[in-house]
A protein has these predicted regions:
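Structural signature of alpha-solenoid helical repeat scaffolds
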Residues: 230, 273, 313, 353, ...
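C-terminal non-catalytic interaction modules
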Residues: 199, 208-228, 232, 578, ...
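Residue register of alpha-helical TPR repeats
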Residues: 237, 276-280, 316, 320, ...
Length: 675
């Protein structure tokens, strides 16, 4: 019975190809079966005169690859119906510059390779671009030959494959028909739940889910899949390559699953693996963990890697070890440790006489000074970058890194930004970086570049220039999705607040929050609430400020973040303390001050190295937090009836500028007199 109705669904979609726009459906059933022997499958496979027919059946016991089966369909169709250069085909489809090398290597050898590494701040952007690329190539191929795809047991698909289906649902193509078979009594993986729910919701809205037999929406008797039960080949070299391929295609959750399966075999089943493969495994797993933001796990894995370094050629492996460890420390915000690791990586690379490792260690040292461009808006001052490093970046083809350096390392002074109102070319390096970002198609970096200038202008009181770049941002990004429109609305609200037009601000912030909520962007929402809190404090609405700050703080805690892009965690606690005491809540003020101090202890008690003059990035010195902590402490003493201690506390911090960067417009005036 299931086979009959399932075949009927396939027939229906096959006959709709080219005639109707929305040709993606889901067929739910409750008793497992295989589609390999269905008569309709054999018939359509043997008759490809009109439509290219492809089917895939996922296993409950085998790890599904990234973008499976779409990658192989693209490669096969290109070879059969187009031929020639696959790179040229990618360019025609608008595939992102940084992804073409990965796709080319997979097309030619089945093994993915990428020279210029992914930056942590661009992970989500690159994942979206890769999904778009896969979908757009399928659409392009369907213009040459209409395409029918049947995927059985689709609930076992990787996150990247499910994201591709979601993109095709939202951007339908009449020449593509897809039937998704789902065994309703077997649950998919936890990492895919969010996007899976979005697919189901979209298909339900279009009445595109068929329930065969008794397969209604089941909540009981649903079986879960266990990673430990997944089969992998005992040829570990092949398994590690598969995990590496998945990682290079940016499906990090699925790559982590693959690595965990290998790890389980090694630790609990005493499987044998040669040392060379084991070293590679730990490095692939560590890179995957870094790009998932799991730095502690990555450091643990690099330590496992170090224990396997052979005496022969140890300098090469030690350079790789310290490079990876420095990367982890950099993204953790432990910049001094990161710098020491980068230096060790460089020293061992020199001993190994490996020019590539020398270059990577030098580049890491430069990135550390800018916190890896992760969770920052701008740098306090210009970062020195030698001409030699610039030349090496060009030589090695690290164009994305070079664009980041041009944008963030230079043109950070108020005077230069002020002059750009009349002539943007005065921002010489910034303009170079902007042009390079546009050339390689990195829309995220173009947006971030404009945001850097907006933030620099705003914090310097140059609100007209800030608005100029808000407009430029909107003009460039308006066709690139709601996420950027939401961020532009946030920028408008921020600058209106800086100009004292506080009553207009909430409209823009609320519109941004609504868009970001729909897009499921919790970190961005937290940043908007942080900005809302500043506006409330300026208006004297301290209870609303506390509420907004608590939303931001809960997001930080829930997502296990070290900070937001707009501020450190300590600053949120300091503002909570300040808003609490101004609203008369002494108990909460004291509690938040204690939390703030826990984050600031390393600043309060550190030994100042007066020989170091460079600034690493905009939040490293915690000046704002130190002032807010001191000011809130003084106000708490004043509230308790102390009349002289508050002034003593403030004099202790007289060298700290008042909210001198992104909140410089938030003026706190105290008019009390000493008793």
């Amino acid at each position: 019975m299931i086979e009959k109705y399932y075949s009927g669904v396939i027939e229906q979609i096959y006959n709709r190809i080219g005639k109707e726009t929305r040709n993606i459906v889901m067929a739910n059933y409750s008793n497992d079966f295989s589609i390999e022997n269905l008569e309709v499958i054999r018939r359509y496979q043997s008759n490809e005169d009109n439509v290219f027919f492809a089917y895939s059946e996922f296993s409950y016991n085998t790890l599904v690859g990234a973008y499976e089966p779409f990658l192989d369909i693209i490669c096969n169709m290109h070879r059969r119906f187009i031929g020639g250069s696959f790179d040229d085909f990618q360019k025609e489809c608008g595939v992102y510059y940084l992804h073409r090398q990965v796709l080319n290597s997979y097309y030619e050898t089945g093994e993915c390779f990428r020279e210029e590494t992914v930056l942590l701040n661009e992970v989500a952007y690159e994942q979206r671009r890769m999904t778009m690329a896969i979908a757009d190539m399928l659409k392009k191929l369907s213009e040459v030959k209409p395409l029918m795809i049947v995927i059985n047991r689709f609930q076992m698909a990787s996150k990247s494959s499910i994201e591709t289906i979601k993109y095709l649902i939202d951007n339908p193509c009449a020449n593509i028909g897809i039937v998704l078979g789902v065994n309703a009594i077997v649950k998919g993986t936890d990492s895919t739940v969010e996007v899976w729910d979005r697919i189901v919701e979209s298909l339900e809205d279009r009445s595109a889910i068929y329930y065969i037999g008794s397969a209604g929406p089941l909540k009981n008797n649903v079986k879960t899949t266990n990673d430990d039960e997944l089969y992998i080949t005992m040829n570990f070299e092949q398994s590690i390559q598969e995990a590496s391929n998945i990682m290079e295609f940016l499906d990090f959750e699925q790559a982590r699953r693959g690595c965990r399966i290998i790890e389980h075999k090694l630790k609990f089943e005493d499987a044998w693996i040669d040392e060379k493969s084991l070293r590679r495994f730990y490095m692939v797993y560590a890179r995957t963990s870094v790009l998932l933001g799991e730095m502690s796990k990555a450091i643990e894995l690099t330590n496992e890697y170090k224990a396997l370094i052979p005496e022969n050629d140890s300098e090469h492996y030690l350079s790789l070890y310290y490079f990876m460890k420095g990367t982890c420390y950099m993204y953790q915000g432990k910049l001094e440790k990161a710098g020491n690791s980068a230096k060790s990586a460089y020293d061992y690379a020199v001993l190994a006489e490996d020019d590539t490792l020398i270059f990577k260690a030098e580049l890491l040292s430069v990135m550390i000074k800018m916190s890896g461009w992760y969770n920052i808006f701008f740098c306090v001052q210009d970062i020195p970058v030698s001409d030699e490093i610039i030349e090496k970046l060009i030589k090695h083809g690290y164009r994305n890194h070079l664009a980041h350096i041009y944008i963030y390392a230079y043109d950070n002074s108020r005077d230069v930004v002020k002059q750009s109102f009349y002539d943007e070319s005065l921002l010489k390096h910034f303009t170079k970086g902007l042009e390079l970002a546009k050339e390689i198609g990195n829309e995220q970096l173009v947006y971030d570049a404009y945001q850097k200038t907006i933030m620099l202008a705003s914090t310097s009181g140059l609100n007209e220039i800030a608005f100029l770049y808000v407009i430029r941002t909107y003009e460039f990004m308006k066709g690139h999705g709601n996420i950027y429109v939401a961020r532009v609305l946030t920028s408008i609200g921020y600058n209106l607040s800086a100009m004292g037009k506080n009553e207009l601000v909430d409209n823009y912030y609320n519109a941004a929050i609504n868009m970001l909520y729909y897009l499921k962007m919790p970190e961005d929402i937290a940043e908007v609430y942080y900005n809302k809190s500043l506006n409330y404090i300026m208006q004297g609405n301290y209870k609303e400020a506390v509420h907004a700050l608590l939303v931001a703080m809960k997001t930080i805690i829930k997502l296990h973040l070290n900070s937001l892009r707009v501020c450190n965690t300590s600053k949120v606690y300091a503002l909570l303390a300040l808003a609490s005491i101004f609203s008369g809540d002494r108990f909460s003020c004291e509690r938040y001050l204690l939390s703030c101090k826990q984050f600031l202890n390393y600043v309060i008690y550190r030994v100042i190295d007066t020989t170091r003059t460079e600034a690493v990035h905009d939040y490293s010195r915690c000046d704002d937090e130190m002032f807010l902590y001191s000011f809130a402490s003084a106000m708490l003493l004043w509230h308790d009836g102390e009349r002289k201690k508050p002034f003593y506390v403030l004099r202790m911090r007289r060298d700290i500028s008042l909210m001198r960067r992104e909140t410089n417009f938030l003026h706190i005036r105290y008019t009390g007199k000493a008793g």
